[in-house]
Amino acid sequence: MNETSNRDHQVTSKEILDVAFEKSKSKFTTPRQTIQDTEELQSYQQTKRKEFEQHINKNRLNLGQWTRYAKWEIENNHDFPRARSILERALDVNIQHVPFWIQYIQLELSHKNINHARNLMERAINTLPRVNKLWFLYVQTEEMLKNYPMVRAVFERWLDWHPDTSAWDAYINFEARYEEKENVRTIFKKYVHEFPNAGTWYKWIKYEMENNRDDVNTVRAVFESAVDTLLSNKSEENDDDEEFATIISSWTSWEVSCGEASRANEIFKLLLDNKTNKLEISDQTKSSIYTAFVEFEKNFGNKDSIEQSVLIKRRIKYEQEIQNDPYDYDSWWKYMTLLQNSSNKSDLENAFKKVTGNVVHDKHKSIKWRRYIMFWIWYAFWEEMTNNNPVSAREIWNNCLKVIPHKSFTFAKVWIGYSEFELRNSEDGLAKARKILGRAIGQTSINKPKIKIFKYYIDLEKKLGDWNRVRLLFQKWLEVSLLTTSSSELVIEKYVEFESSIEEYDRCDSILSSARQLSENPEYSSSFNLQRLLEITVEFYKEEMQYDKIREIYRALLDKDPNAHNWISFALFESSIPSAEQLEEYLQGDNEEFEATVDESQIESTRNIFEEAMTYFKDKDDKESRLVIIEAWRDFEEVNGSDESLSKVTKRLPVIVRKRRTVGSIEEEYIDYIFPDDESKKLPGKMSKFLANAKKWAQQN
């Protein structure tokens, strides 16, 4: 009886999990090990050492393990000899590992083993003399111990290895901290010999000026030595050294502060005198020195000498740059600004003729062309505004248009500038401006419409209130876009905005209908982005609250192009418009502003569209599109649906499986999607077939 009951009782998975959970609640604590006598201590030490040795043998290059081993010996056993032995063994493995050297040294220092640490630092710098970090650690340690003679000795040994400037700077800072001025000067003498550049000399000068400014002879001697050395050792690598100009500026400023303005003036003249060929100073350095000289003249020169020297110097500089490169428009601009400010009319006019006479040869609309055209525009405005010569200005505008290769590219700012010029300076300026803008459209619409010109012309006619001309311009813009297969959505959008602004809603409807018809014409379809055109159309009809019209457009679109994106757009549209109740409430209310909220009726409409899309792609056996639809539906439910509706949609997501098929004579792997909707319909057939086979088997037996 008991056997029968045991056989009938089956252990469930829940019971197994309950037992496992109860067992997991049991608390297991590691037994605490206590050491009672010396033998147990030795046994424990032997065990730990064996563990460390095993870890080290596994990876001898892991120097961190060696360090942990040594620290354990010190912290737990106070066995420094054994710890040092371990660290020495680690050095045998990799003696060039700088962080390990530092850890070894700091370990000794932390336990106040100064002599051991000093011996280690000696070994370290002898082993790795090119590593600055070890030298820095050595000198910092000795300075901390106030062993200053030893610090100097270490620095001197370090300098024998010809280190970089950081070592020299550290040595100088050390001596400067303890105000050992003579020692600092001695080091600087070696420093400038080792690094004979302007930066090194400037450090010395800066030190003397900060600490010994009243010692005039010494400071001047350093300045003179610096300049003499740098000029005599001029080479390509320091030829344009900006620090040299800084030294000169500092020298002259210091001389002035000492009441030696005449000496400072002589220094500038000596360096800037072009007749003197003894000093080879680069143009860049000389320019920097000249800038300092100008500042000097402002403070100590007379007005005439200052202005004359500045203008002449800058003019010569710009003329040389222009002569070297006639297309250096930056120099041209500075040069002509200088001439304009100096009221030199004839020279400025000649400069305008020269710069506009050098036509750019680039075949594309390059930055050179853009800068070149700006000089033409400046030239025309200068003649009109400054010289009051509209005849000459008109000729300049025409000549500018002649040099532009309009078949390749053009400049809207020139056409617009010319038309505005005629508006300002002619009795029949409006007619001339329209003629210029019409000519611009004709000459610049060979490859594609020049949008800036169309926009400017349309805005002009809007200001004049000539709606018929505005419509003609929009139609011309659209015509050019279609003939040149350019994007036409912008002109449609702007055209609709214009008609809507003057409340011509029937015209807007006609424009959008015509645009849709043109987009369906194979001859013009390449000029339209259907998605953007749809957005413009939907946006307009939404503003007009013609939601049924939008639905008709979507249905027509789905008949022609029933892709997943269009279905999703249609579905989401239903949730972006107000419900009938919300619309009725708005129409009966007094509020001018209206904000639609998503309620259940809108959500249900969106779901119906998604369901319709799923059915459509299921009938077409387009599983990829079904996947896109169901994922979009899921995203929609996450935002607007309930947990129940989201769960229903989530359960309809397909299972991704990998299958193989033979294409031709080649077997390939592909991804298939198994939808639960499809499997649920197949299940009854499989079950009936299984039952039929079972019945047949039973009859045979």
UniProtKB/Swiss-Prot annotation:
Keyword Repeat attributed: yes
Top-level taxon: Eukaryota
Protein's recorded name: Pre-mRNA-splicing factor CLF1
GO molecular function, one term: DNA replication origin binding
Keywords in alphabetical order: mRNA processing, mRNA splicing, Nucleus, Repeat, Spliceosome
InterPro entries: HAT, HAT_Syf1-like_N, HAT_Syf1_CNRKL1_C, Syf1-like, TPR-like_helical_dom_sf
Localization of this protein: Nucleus
Task of the protein: Involved in pre-mRNA splicing and cell cycle progression. Required for the spliceosome assembly and initiation of the DNA replication.
Subunit structure: Associated with the spliceosome.
GO CC annotations on file: chromatin; post-mRNA release spliceosomal complex; Prp19 complex; U2-type catalytic step 1 spliceosome; U2-type catalytic step 2 spliceosome; U2-type post-mRNA release spliceosomal complex; U2-type prespliceosome
Record-linked Pfam families: HAT_Syf1_CNRKL1_C, HAT_Syf1_CNRKL1_N
Annotated family: Belongs to the crooked-neck family.
Repeat (HAT) residue spans along the chain: 43-75, 78-110, 112-144, 146-177, 179-210, 214-253, 266-299, 309-341, 343-378, 388-424, 545-576, 601-642
GO biological process, one term: DNA replication initiation
